[in-house]
Amino acid sequence: MTNAIIEKAKERFAHTHESLAREFGAIRAGRANASLLDRITVEYYGAPTPLNQLASITVPEARVLLISPFDKGSIADIERAINESDLGINPANDGSVIRLVIPALTEETRKELAKEVKKVGENAKIAIRNIRRDAMDEAKKQEKEKEITEDQLKTLEKDIQKATDDAVNKIDSMIAEKEKELLTV
């Protein structure tokens, strides 16, 4: 039963890491990356549809994204969705494909994005600490209900703390990696 608490916490830690990686992918680093467009939804025949389901997205050059719609009739809708998004990138429509040229980041923009990375990373650490608290509460509840002994509780708390420390260290390394990517010219 005690291992179930740790396994559940580790599973939730992994979900937090995946979520953080997705959020970091959406922060542009001056290089083209298809994940920049993950959050864009297109109004297609009256239904909001993710862009990656309406078109293939390729990276032909370091700072260019090429969007090839499966249905050429949707190209105007895709262009409108990109213009309305908060990407700050103007699409170039040539009738059959849309080109997005990712502008080089200024030093000021890089620093702002690095701050955003730290903020997002800090939120992930808060989520990790909340998961730890939930696991600790569950362990104390089991000890209170005499399902485990006090010694088992202490061991379990140490194991939960070690798993938490590992999860936080992974977040720190993810933050450092993304900051390095952003600040490298």
From Swiss-Prot:
It holds the Pfam family RRF. GO terms for molecular function: ribosomal large subunit binding. Keywords: Cytoplasm, Protein biosynthesis. Belongs to the RRF family. Its main location: cytoplasm. It comes from Streptococcus thermophilus (strain ATCC BAA-491 / LMD-9). This is Ribosome-recycling factor. GO terms for biological process: translational termination. Responsible for the release of ribosomes from messenger RNA at the termination of protein biosynthesis. May increase the efficiency of translation by recycling ribosomes from one round of translation to another. The gene is frr.
